[in-house]
Amino acid sequence: MALKIRLRQQGRRNHVVYRLVLADVESPRDGRYIELLGWYDPHSAVNYQLKGDRIFHWLSQGAELTEKAAVLIKQGAPGVYSELMAKQAARKAAVCQKRRAYRQRRSLKRAEAAKAAAK
């Protein structure tokens, strides 16, 4: 069961309000959701309210963000978003380091094999 944090449309015609929800990937846009994580009202003075701790919890559990939800979280909970980006950068750096070490080991083995074949 893959989870996504996305916007769910609410409200009425010409006055749409969005809920930031955690939902299964296969559920419809306005269908069932697992947890309400906040809301966004583009028409009012107070535009949004987000539960930063719950968003961080679900992101650390492996939930994915949609593009629009990521923009809203970056604006409304910058600490959560920056921490998420730092974790992703650290993960990428670790993968790059492992790949670099593997390539070095592989090139050393190839060099040794070439020396042995030359003898």
Curated annotation (Swiss-Prot):
Cellular component annotations (GO), alphabetically ordered: cytoplasm; small ribosomal subunit
The protein's name: Small ribosomal subunit protein bS16
Entry keyword annotation includes Ribonucleoprotein: yes
NCBIfam families membership: PRK14522.1, S16
GO biological process, one term: translation
InterPro entries given in the database record: Ribosomal_bS16, Ribosomal_bS16_dom_sf
Keyword annotations from UniProtKB, A to Z: Ribonucleoprotein, Ribosomal protein
Pfam family, one: Ribosomal_S16
Family in the record: Belongs to the bacterial ribosomal protein bS16 family.
GO MF entries: structural constituent of ribosome
This protein's record includes keyword Ribosomal protein: yes
Annotated signal peptide: none
